[in-house]
Amino acid sequence: MATKSLTVVVSQSPSRNPAKRNLEEELVAACLVDDTVDVAVVPHLYNLDAQHSGTMFLKSIPGHLVLLSWMYPRASHWLLDRAGIKGRQGETLLDEEMDDEDIEIPEPAGIGGVDVPDRNIYCLDLGVDDDPGVFLDEIKRIVSELNVETVELMDWISGSPQPEQLERYLDPMSVLGGEADLEPVKRRWYPVIDYERCTNCMECIDFCLFGVYGVDTLDRILVEEQDNCKKGCPACSRVCPE
């Protein structure tokens, strides 16, 4: 079977909104008959912990990746990064809705990511449009732009957890229909650092009372104990100068 240049992952909405579910299903159904991409479905990205099989599955994906989720692209990218699913931020042509199109966004002056592999991760916000064709056209554009060879998805499914656990994610329609016996998730609340904007000023670690933040071996700020974060607490984001 020919190798595919791109893997498309749909991260489900945490709600049971029928319009959102319908959009997810239409996208998956279209990708399943597209012989240029692999497609899979995982639970809402924010609710996956480091040991969840959904996280392990995402780590097993080789090559370039398109993530379709109900989050802003920056948030999606850095959620993946903090889980060890790294790559360059792929440029997309989908426009985010903005309250004021004349707002000038300064160039990021952050410390940036580390150990970024030679692949692109394209994060698309499903909230931008309710027409699946908009996203499918963008996926086709990305495929034609990449035109690279990668090893097949199944070749990478090994190790822990067991392959049969990860293979469930390769049957996306059963996941969407609730037929797959997937590991459950619970709603979580924790901060995510955007290292393109973070200047390592340490205001958040100084301000947080709950021991959420720490530093790595390079003395860079990181989220060390995310589940210590108190639900609804916005303190660190408010004190952040960026």
Predicted ranges, named:
Residues 32, 36-37, 85, 144, ...:
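Generic secondary-structure signature for well-ordered alpha-helical cores
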Residues 8-137:
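Cofactor-cradling patches in redox/metallo enzymes
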Residues 178-200, 211-238:
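Ferredoxin-like iron-sulfur electron-transfer modules
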Residues 1-5:
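Glycine-rich phosphate/diphosphate-binding loops that line cofactor/substrate pockets in enzymes
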Residues 9-14, 93, 209-210, 215, ...:
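Proteins with a high burden of low-complexity, intrinsically disordered sequence enriched in S/T/G/P/A and R
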Residues 13-16, 66, 70-75, 199-210, ...:
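Local cysteine-cluster metal-coordination motifs and their immediate loop/turn environment
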Residues 38, 204, 214:
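Residue-level detector of anion-binding/catalytic polar loops
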Residues 17-20, 80-82, 101-207:
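Ferredoxin-type iron-sulfur electron-transfer modules and their immediate structural context
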